[in-house]
């Protein structure tokens, strides 16, 4: 997700919530300790620091009273406006030129601090902003002081969130990733490979590529998102927010700290779409347009065309269309992360994804390009979409509703998979590869008959390590009621047991059935991948293992199977090093 264009104090929040033809994951990333470089978080530009210490603080109000030397108020106002426009558009080179042209003083220090924050030199930003606030030269109230306080809190929050971070740079130099916890460096080669695919595909789709490395920050606690953005802890947990794009960087939560992981690679590409749209439109795209394109194109790294809505989202959209209970564009502002539930957020995504999907299907890439060009020129986004489609927005909206109602008619739905944050007491078990999904009443949906009784006994026996008897109980459950014989949850548990019992041929059809129902469950996908490998279906195994990897790469045994099916010697060596049975 990404901010709406406007002055900083009115900015919308930058927020968010598998292959085909993918390149081999590049090896040998360049590793740096973030504090070991003069341009890294943890370092302070000595020239700017000296300026703060000797000339006093730098920034913006249309008055010369807080500047070190007299300056024409109109000149200052023009400089401040140009700076705000540049920083909002992430044009840091232009913003730096403006700061250099500003006279010394506390107002300039504020703008220099904002620039340093966007450069991710957080200690430098803190020094500049804290100096400006403490100088006594800023007005006691007003936009400039609010701006200084806002970015000072963010600069301090970013340092607390990242701590003694480490940094890896992709072999092509196009991506840099900063990790708050070194354990999460495991994801780097997979992220670099996906981003190489995304850069090529999305560059063609959107007609733009960054001329600088794209910065990712990977956090080891979802709560830390509230330290580095205007989000609150409640926003994060209510809507399951795991990624944001703001201040010219992408910030994500590690899948390691989620109960069952999450689609972290799709999320990374989703956020990268925001990044590109922000650059292309100079940050003038509203939330609904940003989110629609990001959701539509988030799978382009692994698919030649955008993928259709998943059944749960399709069901949500069909129900909302029938009840005329859609999320309005106004409700989406300033961020989908501020909607009241994961269901409403998922519905909003489904709406805007399919709206932009209809435009792309019917007008092609040229339609998307015209829409973005018009928005970049300052045109209202709804009017721009209407022009790109070829009629009024009202007629487009009616057409889109009709199309989606027809597509959803008679199609199966499914339960929405909600993101769950890992509790501290679950961390050790998850890192050891334990499947926490067996906890609780797993088979309550089977009702109160014999099938459920046998299935529950199967769970208890599994937890006690009696795998053979557990499998027999699951078979009895399937035999007890024809309606549950094909139950995907039951199929999964039985398939996993047969795999552990050394019967992969019996496991494959059961795990495949379960995977059709829940393709994003990483433990299930990993089990299916192993079963397919053991029966000799290496191509099928690679597909299943890739599903697991893009949701939770921290399943220890997953890498053992990836090593066995790897065709590239470098990949094989890397995966073997990560293998933990």
Would you name each region that the model predicts?
Residues 20-23:
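Bacterial signal peptide processing site
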Residues 1-11:
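Bacterial N-terminal signal peptides that target proteins for export
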Residues 164-287, 297-306, 318, 323-326, ...:
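Juxtacatalytic substrate-recognition/specificity segment
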Residues 72-76, 88, 92, 106, ...:
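Solvent-exposed, acidic/flexible segments
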Residues 88, 118, 130-138, 196, ...:
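Sec-exported extracytoplasmic/periplasmic mature domains
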Residues 146-169, 173-175, 557-581:
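Terminal, low-structured helical/coil segments at or just beyond the last alpha-helical repeat
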Residues 69-70, 102-108, 134-151, 283, ...:
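Short solvent-exposed coil/turn linkers within tandem alpha-helical repeat scaffolds
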Residues 28-30, 36-101, 127-131, 343-346, ...:
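Beta/coil-rich, acidic/histidine-enriched accessory regions frequently appended to metallopeptidases
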């Amino acid at each position: 997700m990404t901010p709406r264009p406007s002055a900083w104090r009115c900015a919308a929040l930058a927020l968010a919530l598998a292959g085909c033809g993918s390149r081999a994951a590049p090896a040998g990333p360049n590793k740096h300790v973030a504090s070991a470089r003069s341009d890294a978080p943890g370092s302070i530009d000595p020239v700017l620091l000296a300026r703060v210490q000797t000339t006093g603080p730098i920034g913006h109000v249309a008055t010369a009273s807080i500047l070190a030397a007299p300056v024409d108020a109109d000149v200052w106002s023009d400089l401040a406006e140009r700076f705000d426009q540049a920083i909002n558009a992430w044009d840091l080179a232009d913003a730096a030129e403006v700061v250099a042209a500003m006279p010394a003083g506390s107002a300039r220090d504020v703008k220099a601090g904002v620039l340093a924050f966007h450069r991710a030199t957080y200690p430098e930003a803190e020094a500049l902003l804290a100096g400006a606030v403490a100088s006594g030269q800023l007005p006691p109230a007003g936009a400039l002081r609010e701006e200084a306080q806002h970015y000072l809190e963010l600069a301090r929050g970013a340092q607390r969130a990242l701590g003694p971070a480490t940094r890896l740079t992709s072999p092509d130099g196009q991506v840099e990733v900063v990790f708050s916890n070194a354990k999460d460096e495991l994801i780097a080669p997979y992220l670099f490979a996906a981003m190489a695919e995304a850069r090529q595909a999305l560059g063609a789709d959107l007609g733009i590529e960054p001329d600088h490395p794209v910065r990712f920050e990977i956090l080891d606690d979802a709560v830390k998102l509230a330290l580095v953005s205007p989000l609150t802890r409640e926003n994060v947990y209510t809507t399951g927010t795991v990624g944001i794009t703001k201040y010219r960087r992408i910030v994500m939560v590690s899948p390691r700290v989620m109960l069952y992981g999450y689609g972290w690679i799709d999320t990374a590409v989703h956020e990268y779409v925001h990044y590109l749209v922000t650059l292309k439109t100079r940050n003038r795209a509203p939330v609904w347009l940003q989110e629609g394109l990001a959701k539509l194109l988030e799978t382009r790294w692994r698919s030649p065309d955008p993928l259709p809505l998943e059944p749960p989202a399709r069901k949500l959209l069909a129900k909302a269309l029938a009840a005329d209970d859609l999320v309005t564009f106004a409700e989406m502002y300033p961020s989908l992360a501020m909607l009241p539930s994961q269901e409403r957020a998922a519905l909003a995504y489904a709406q805007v994804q399919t709206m932009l999907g209809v435009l792309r299907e019917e007008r092609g890439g040229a339609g998307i390009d015209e829409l973005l060009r018009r928005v970049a020129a300052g045109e209202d986004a709804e009017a721009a979409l209407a022009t790109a489609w070829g009629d009024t927005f009202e007629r487009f909206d009616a057409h889109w509703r009709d199309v989606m109602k027809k597509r959803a008619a008679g199609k199966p739905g499914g339960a929405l998979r909600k993101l769950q944050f890992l509790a501290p007491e679950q961390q050790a078990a998850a890192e050891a590869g334990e499947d926490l999904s067996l906890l609780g009443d797993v088979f309550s949906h089977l009702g109160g008959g014999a099938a459920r009784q046998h299935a529950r006994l199967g769970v208890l026996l599994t937890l006690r390590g009696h795998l053979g008897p557990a499998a027999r109980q699951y078979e009895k459950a399937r035999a007890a009621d024809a309606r549950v014989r094909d139950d995907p949850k039951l199929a999964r548990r039985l398939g996993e047991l047969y795999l552990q019992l050394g019967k992969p041929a019996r496991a494959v059809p059961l795990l495949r059935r379960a995977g059709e129902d829940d393709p994003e469950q990483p433990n299930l996908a990993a089990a299916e991948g192993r079963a397919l490998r053991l029966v000799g279906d290496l191509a099928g195994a690679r597909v299943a293992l890739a599903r697991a990897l893009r949701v939770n790469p921290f399943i220890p045994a997953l890498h053992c199977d990836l090593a066995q099916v790897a065709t590239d010697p470098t990949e094989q060596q890397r995966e073997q090093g990560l293998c933990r049975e």
